[in-house]
């Protein structure tokens, strides 16, 4: 922001000038002290608090270290990691739909290992960001994260990714997620609901989510998803389980073309299908959507694609 911006004139220079003038009127010999105080205030405001807009800290060109603030185990192999930003008012500055890269030097690996993750927090939550990570036996970064203690640091770079969600970019979004593939979907769902007309926004996008997992306990972030669906009639969830409990009313087995046809928007120029999950599942969903008449997914998705794979 320019030092001569309207925001700084009204929020920094004007109060400082009033302090000096007011002091001159009351007691002239105090003016030098008032000038010094005003100068200090101006310098502080311009360097730290001169803008009401939060500072974006992500750098797409270089890794930065962020301190682990909290670890919250939500199952035997799934943890939410909260990393602190440099200042309480800072935000990541991550566009909706994009992700960040985590890097670490891991013993036995010839070079630094880098993996992508989507935060489950959003930029309206300042001072930190949250990552939901499932530790896989062969997952170098996910296993590395489990070794971190509060106070340790993690190297982060971003934003990256071809998806940048903007309000009303399409009429209806269909989502198919498996396991931790729910994280980019949640980011978009929360942004849409936060920007509904009832909340002062203008986003009227309809959203239908098919969320596939093996067991009931594998359904990540279920409470948050259920809360969002309960408060917003434009968002609907259909769960699919490989091993359903007795009395289960959702889908059973793998996500099928029939499930997609019944639950997600039909092919049209103003809809999108978003896919995220284990590679075998995403591959199967690409074939299924193509068989139903959706535009064939590209090997590397672009923003304009009808079927987009994270």
Swiss-Prot record:
Query: Carries keyword Cell wall biogenesis/degradation?
Result: no
Q: What Enzyme Commission number(s) appear in the record?
A: 1.6.2.2
Reaction catalysed by this enzyme: 2 Fe(III)-[cytochrome b5] + NADH = 2 Fe(II)-[cytochrome b5] + NAD(+) + H(+); 2 Fe(3+)-[Dph3] + NADH = 2 Fe(2+)-[Dph3] + NAD(+) + H(+)
Give one Pfam family, short name only.
FAD_binding_6
Q: Which cofactor does it need?
A: FAD
Q: Which UniProt keywords apply?
A: FAD, Flavoprotein, Membrane, Mitochondrion, Mitochondrion outer membrane, NAD, Oxidoreductase, Transferase, Transmembrane, Transmembrane helix
Q: Which GO terms describe its molecular function?
A: cytochrome-b5 reductase activity, acting on NAD(P)H; NADH dehydrogenase activity; transferase activity
Question: What parts of the sequence cross the membrane?
Answer: 30-50
- Which InterPro entries does the record cross-reference, listed alphabetically? CBR-like, Cbr1-like_FAD-bd_dom, FAD-bd_FR_type, Flavoprot_Pyr_Nucl_cyt_Rdtase, FNR_nucleotide-bd, OxRdtase_FAD/NAD-bd, Riboflavin_synthase-like_b-brl
Q: Name the family the entry cites.
A: Belongs to the flavoprotein pyridine nucleotide cytochrome reductase family.
> What is the role of this chain?
NADH-dependent reductase for dph3 and cytochrome b5. Required for the first step of diphthamide biosynthesis, a post-translational modification of histidine which occurs in elongation factor 2. Dph1 and dph2 transfer a 3-amino-3-carboxypropyl (ACP) group from S-adenosyl-L-methionine (SAM) to a histidine residue, the reaction is assisted by a reduction system comprising dph3 and a NADH-dependent reductase, predominantly cbr1. By reducing dph3, also involved in the formation of the tRNA wobble base modification mcm5s 2U (5-methoxycarbonylmethyl-2-thiouridine), mediated by the elongator complex.
Under what name is this protein listed?
Answer: NADH-cytochrome b5 reductase 1
| Organism of origin | Emericella nidulans (strain FGSC A4 / ATCC 38163 / CBS 112.46 / NRRL 194 / M139) (Aspergillus nidulans)
């Amino acid at each position: 922001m320019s030092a001569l911006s309207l925001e700084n004139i009204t929020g920094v220079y004007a109060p400082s000038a009033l302090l000096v003038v007011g002091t001159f009127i009351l007691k002239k010999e105090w003016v030098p002290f008032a000038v010094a105080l005003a100068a200090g205030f101006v310098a502080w405001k311009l360097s730290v608090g001169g803008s009401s807009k939060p500072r974006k800290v992500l750098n797409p060109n270089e890794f930065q270290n962020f301190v682990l603030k909290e670890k919250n185990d939500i199952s035997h192999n799934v943890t939410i990691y909260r990393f602190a930003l440099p200042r309480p008012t800072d935000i990541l500055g991550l566009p909706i739909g994009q992700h960040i890269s985590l890097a670490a030097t891991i013993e036995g690996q010839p070079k630094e290992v880098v993996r992508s993750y989507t935060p489950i927090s959003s930029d309206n939550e300042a001072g930190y960001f949250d990552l939901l990570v499932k530790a896989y036996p062969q997952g170098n970064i996910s296993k590395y994260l489990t070794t971190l203690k509060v106070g340790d640091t993690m190297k982060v770079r971003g934003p990256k990714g071809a998806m940048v969600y903007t309000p009303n970019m399409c009429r209806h979004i269909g989502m198919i997620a498996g396991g931790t593939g729910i994280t980019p979907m949640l980011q978009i769902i929360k942004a849409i609901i936060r920007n509904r007309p009832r909340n002062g926004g203008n986003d009227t996008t309809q959203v239908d989510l098919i969320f596939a997992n093996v067991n009931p306990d594998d359904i990540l972030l279920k409470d948050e998803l259920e809360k969002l669906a309960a408060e917003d009639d434009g968002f609907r969830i259909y769960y699919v389980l490989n091993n359903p409990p007795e009395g289960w009313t959702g889908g059973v087995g793998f996500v099928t073309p029939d499930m997609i046809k019944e639950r997600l928007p039909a092919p049209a120029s103003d809809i999108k299908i978003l896919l995220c999950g284990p590679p075998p599942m995403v591959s199967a969903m690409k074939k299924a959507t193509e068989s139903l008449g959706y535009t064939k997914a590209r090997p590397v998705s672009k923003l304009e694609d009808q079927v987009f794979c994270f």
